Amino acid sequence: NCPAGCRSQGCCM
């Protein structure tokens, strides 16, 4: 899982 906000920045795929 990715921290909140990371997913929207595309740093976690």
Curated annotation (Swiss-Prot):
Gene Ontology MF term list: calcium channel regulator activity; toxin activity
Keyword DNA-binding: no
Record note on modification: Contains 2 disulfide bonds.
Tissue: Expressed by the venom duct.
Any single Gene Ontology cellular-component annotation: extracellular region
Chief location: secreted
Functional summary from the UniProt entry: Omega-conotoxins act at presynaptic membranes, they bind and block voltage-gated calcium channels (Cav). Reversibly blocks calcium current in the dorsal-root ganglion neurons of the rat (high voltage-activated channels but not low voltage-activated channels). Does not modify the voltage dependency of activation and inactivation.
Name under which the protein is recorded: Omega-conotoxin Cl16a
